[in-house]
Amino acid sequence: MAIKVSIDASGGDYGIPVTIVAGIKALNIFQDLHLYFVGNEPSITTELGKYPSNTLNSRYTIIHASEVVLMNESPAIALRKKKDSSMRIAINLVKTFKADACVSAGNTGALMAISRFVLRTIKGIDRPAIMGRMPTITGHTHMLDLGANVDSKPKALVEFATMGSIAVKHTENIESPTIGLLNIGEEDMKGSEKIRKAATLLKASNLNYVGFVEGNDIYKGIVDLIVCDGFEGNIALKASEGVASMMEHYLKQAFTRNLLTKLVSLIAIPVLKDFKSSLNPDKYNGASLLGLRGIVVKSHGSANIDSFLTAITEAYIEAHAKISDKISLQISKELEHNE
């Protein structure tokens, strides 16, 4: 059976020139994938006309949307006044089970607000959380929340850990993902009362909680999942992106300083390519909005074609694994157990 993914084609900084091409690439990679391209139909048709293929025509559907949620638009305006936006229609397709997942590079706040309104949260989950991948020396780790919730209570952090553990288990084929709680130290007495309380709850749970992790542990790959409040998580994410950008800048500067360094750079090209690839944000694009009654994946607003393709791939994998259903089932079991 085909995996169906709705694409907010008009969303993001670049819209249709990026989302459509990434979609065509995804269709060529995943033979059981069907895409709904949602956005301005004439513009989508024009873009698709650049990539004629008789074999792909039957594997995508164009759905017209007369409105677009702007990147600087308030979530309230997007929710109340733009009911025919490409974002809203793409999410509605998940609500009506026509699509198994949705991908958008649009406004994060609007995407979360519309997703919560249209799809609703899973019973037993107070608030959805955003989970993404972070590069490590061993490959990558997962982290949530990356910005959906500020000042989360201990119970919410445990919910994040539960949802994240299920998602990592079924998308990475890790039977019992290790979980760390982001803190300012590894000792039990370190951190705020909220963090210490969350640690106590996690220790008492059935999750594979291994203890506190510090900021410098994020990139060591010592755990499969790092749990934190959205405030700290978003800062860590942006700091990571900033450091990667700075390192690339310094390397360019160092290797173009004079003739000798330019010659050295020619010798070092293979190493530099591997280095750049390991930190390339395109490889880690596609953050999951966990806790909804449906799968929604958020792409970077400034995503290029390859980066948006990564987000589509994430949605495809989650849809195959039925992540939302598995989270719902586990939370339901826990609610029954606690009654």
Swiss-Prot record:
Key words of the record: Cytoplasm, Lipid biosynthesis, Lipid metabolism, Phospholipid biosynthesis, Phospholipid metabolism, Transferase
What are the GO cellular component annotations?
cytoplasm
Q: Does the keyword Lipid metabolism apply?
A: yes
Q: What is its main location?
A: cytoplasm
Pfam families per UniProt: FA_synthesis
Gene3D superfamilies cross-referenced by the UniProt entry: Isopropylmalate Dehydrogenase
Q: Has the keyword Lipid metabolism been applied to this entry? A: yes
The alphabetized list of GO BP terms reads: fatty acid biosynthetic process; phospholipid biosynthetic process
EC number(s) stated in the UniProt entry for this protein: 2.3.1.274
Catalyzed reactions per annotation: a fatty acyl-[ACP] + phosphate = an acyl phosphate + holo-[ACP]
Alphabetized GO MF terms: phosphate:acyl-[acyl carrier protein] acyltransferase activity
Which pathway is this protein assigned to? Lipid metabolism; phospholipid metabolism
Group of enzyme by EC: transferase
| Cellular compartment(s) | Cytoplasm
Per the entry, what this protein does is: Catalyzes the reversible formation of acyl-phosphate (acyl-PO(4)) from acyl-[acyl-carrier-protein] (acyl-ACP). This enzyme utilizes acyl-ACP as fatty acyl donor, but not acyl-CoA.
- Which protein family is it in? Belongs to the PlsX family.
What is its quaternary makeup? Homodimer. Probably interacts with PlsY.
Q: What is this protein called?
A: Phosphate acyltransferase
- Which organism's genome codes for this protein? Vesicomyosocius okutanii subsp. Calyptogena okutanii (strain HA)
